[in-house]
Amino acid sequence: MKFIIKLFPEIMIKSDSVRKRFIKILTGNIRNILDKHDDSVAVVRHWDFIEVRSKHEENRPHLIELLQCIPGIHHFLEVEERPFTDLHNIFEQTLERMRDELVDKTFCVRAKRRGKHSFSSLEIERYVGGGLNQHIETAKVKLKNPDVTVRIEVDNDKLLFIQARHEGIGGYPIGTQEDVLSLISGGFDSGVSSYMLIRRGSRVHYCFFNLGGAAHEIGVKQMVYHLWNRYGSSHKVRFIAINFEAVVGEILEKIDNGQMGVVLKRMMVRAAGKVAQRFAIEAIVTGEALGQVSSQTLTNLRLIDEAAGTLVLRPLITHDKEQIIAMAKQIGTEDIAKSMPEFCGVISKNPTVKAVRERILAEEEHFDFDILESAVQNAEYLDIRQIAEETAKGVVEIDGVSVLGENDVILDIRSPEETDENPLALENRQVIELPFYKVSSQFGELDQSKNYVLYCERGVMSKLQALYLKENGFNNVQVFVKAK
């Protein structure tokens, strides 16, 4: 099994030294991700493409899914590799492979070539196309919009048949740009803005301001883990949780109602700036869009930035909410975001849309900044790669079972892609498929006389969801543990 990885076009127009560095980093990222799932994978970089090989054909669907989510990959090709002797032999092998597929179809041949040969790419197209047209009576050549495009690549002494093309997410490889710290709330905006910086080549760390208790943090961890696991698992990243309940309490008590929203955002970016400074992170990222809510006017955003002490990036600044939700759906965070309440908006009934700097500074003089400093000092720092261990510590009241009882129903909370690829089939046992991002909204609709045993591949999401359900009063949940 072989894949040819084609690079994001912006990488190819870089200078030689920069392009080589980007390709080297992307090669390492691909290797880091695929090695976890297939120990036979070999990743080799070339001047303008990367070659991926595997000995395990059964892993093909999973490797395709992984490659589609790695930043820096524009598209990749599934190829069948064969030796060849000459141009006529290329035609013979193409005829053997494509004869049945071209019956009663229009077609064209597209060829690419690397190395020294006695023929050009155009000559391959003409010779092979003419031969196919002669030997398959019901096939017809059509150069524009044919039914079938026969794709051939000649790489020195190897003939490559293109079996399929898959699109990647593009962007730059993670690690080619500096680290950033994303202010993640679990909503639509912060999830999408985090993804956009991942795709642009930054290693994204996450800073969460907890305003809603354990259930809020569990929901945010689900989103963060999803973003990291799907798009950024080539790198170690940090999850920082800061309990902001005392800060909000101080604001409610000391700050004028109309100024609360701007002051709260200033406190958040102050705290995030301190965290960023501690880890030498160059910028913080927010999901704010111009005019979307009262605190997101240019006047207010400028005042918020003044408190940050570092660069503030807003990748969604010109996006409409409809666009943001569409992107959230595309990257798989929509349903998680739907279940996440918006805590920041509840503290101010009449927010100002044009805050005055002097008024904000005067209000902040009433604020006890020791409370903010204490919140930052007592922040929880977590390596996302160890989130499973931390989750296990937090769900000691959740039973893990490997033997099922008569009243137990397996609740498969994997994504639809995972269940399609590897369905869970247990003899004489009911299995309900309910993706993890729909559990919070749809679990209550299930038959509550049953006991539900949650299952996912690694046990991380199932533990998070079980804790979430327990927090919300559902005691008929356990976690499925595979027997060793």
Swiss-Prot record:
Transmembrane region(s): none
General function of this protein: Catalyzes the ATP-dependent transfer of a sulfur to tRNA to produce 4-thiouridine in position 8 of tRNAs, which functions as a near-UV photosensor. Also catalyzes the transfer of sulfur to the sulfur carrier protein ThiS, forming ThiS-thiocarboxylate. This is a step in the synthesis of thiazole, in the thiamine biosynthesis pathway. The sulfur is donated as persulfide by IscS.
Alphabetized SUPFAM superfamilies for the sequence: Adenine nucleotide alpha hydrolases-like, Rhodanese/Cell cycle control phosphatase, THUMP domain-like
Annotated S-S bridges: C344-C456
Domain annotation Rhodanese: ranges: 404-483
Gene Ontology cellular-component terms listed: cytosol
Catalytic activity: [ThiI sulfur-carrier protein]-S-sulfanyl-L-cysteine + a uridine in tRNA + 2 reduced [2Fe-2S]-[ferredoxin] + ATP + H(+) = [ThiI sulfur-carrier protein]-L-cysteine + a 4-thiouridine in tRNA + 2 oxidized [2Fe-2S]-[ferredoxin] + AMP + diphosphate; [ThiS sulfur-carrier protein]-C-terminal Gly-Gly-AMP + S-sulfanyl-L-cysteinyl-[cysteine desulfurase] + AH2 = [ThiS sulfur-carrier protein]-C-terminal-Gly-aminoethanethioate + L-cysteinyl-[cysteine desulfurase] + A + AMP + 2 H(+)
THUMP domain ranges (all copies): 61-166
E.C. designation(s): 2.8.1.4
Entry annotated with the keyword Nucleotide-binding: yes
Binding residue positions for ATP: L183, I184, K265, G287, Q296
Family: Belongs to the ThiI family.
HAMAP family: ThiI
Pathway(s) annotated for this protein in UniProt: Cofactor biosynthesis; thiamine diphosphate biosynthesis
Active site, UniProt feature: C456
Enzymatic class: transferase
UniProt-listed InterPro entries: Rhodanese-like_dom, Rhodanese-like_dom_sf, Rossmann-like_a/b/a_fold, ThiI_AANH, ThiI_fer, ThiI_N, THII_Thiazole_biosynth_dom, THUMP_dom
Pfam families: ThiI, ThiI_fer, THUMP
Keywords in alphabetical order: ATP-binding, Cytoplasm, Disulfide bond, Nucleotide-binding, Redox-active center, RNA-binding, Thiamine biosynthesis, Transferase, tRNA-binding
Primary site of residence: cytoplasm
GO MF, one annotated term: tRNA-uracil-4 sulfurtransferase activity
Protein species of origin: Actinobacillus succinogenes (strain ATCC 55618 / DSM 22257 / CCUG 43843 / 130Z)
Protein name: tRNA sulfurtransferase
A biological-process GO annotation: thiazole biosynthetic process
Compartments it resides in: Cytoplasm
